Amino acid sequence: MNITERTIQVIRNRIRSVPDYPSPGVVFRDITPLMEDGPSLHAAVDALAEATRSLDYDRVISAEARGFVFGTALAYRSRKGLVLARKPGKLPREVISVSYELEYGTDSLEVHADAIPPGTRVLVADDLLATGGTARAMCELVEKSGGSVAGCAFLIELGFLEGRKKLLAGYDVISLINYHDPAAE
């Protein structure tokens, strides 16, 4: 399969821009119309799978909640395992935890301590790359577990927030749709 401009346009057409949400001046990129439309969701998953096909990885890690959609699909398509990065207190066994900075405060992600065996190559997958905090935290979880990051894949990148810069420490960063301008459709 080849990722065509037509495929990207099909995906882009299903991402709804919602002005002033969650606060004035913010344009929220709503992917629920894409997920509600079977052919568009299929196109998005196929395109992400194709974009990451050349990467060598053993598992996929994704963060709740929307990241689970694309992480699960990529793990399934590549016949690889899936590691769930959860908010604190959601996993029942021993965990490895990483805290990261948000615009206003901090947050944390956790994985089971045995989810990523040493030497495992892991693909970081999420729906959105914004400031890079969540993605960077997933990379840190992989490395803290003794694994290595094979690459990072996103459906959408908000390029104007420069989250990619937090990930360019040797990681391949792939995004299907990049909004370079906060007001762009």
UniProtKB/Swiss-Prot annotation:
EC number(s) reported in the record: 2.4.2.7
Keyword annotations from UniProtKB, A to Z: Cytoplasm, Glycosyltransferase, Purine salvage, Transferase
Cellular component terms (Gene Ontology): cytoplasm
Broad class of enzyme this protein falls into: transferase
Any one Gene Ontology molecular-function term assigned to this protein's record: adenine phosphoribosyltransferase activity
Functional summary from the UniProt entry: Catalyzes a salvage reaction resulting in the formation of AMP, that is energically less costly than de novo synthesis.
Subunit structure: Homodimer.
UniProt-annotated location(s): Cytoplasm
Keyword check for Glycosyltransferase: yes
Entry protein name: Adenine phosphoribosyltransferase
Catalysis: reaction(s): AMP + diphosphate = 5-phospho-alpha-D-ribose 1-diphosphate + adenine
Disulfide bonds: none
Any one Gene Ontology BP term: purine ribonucleoside salvage
Family affiliation: Belongs to the purine/pyrimidine phosphoribosyltransferase family.
Pathway: Purine metabolism; AMP biosynthesis via salvage pathway; AMP from adenine: step 1/1
Pfam families linked: Pribosyltran
Main localization (coarse): cytoplasm
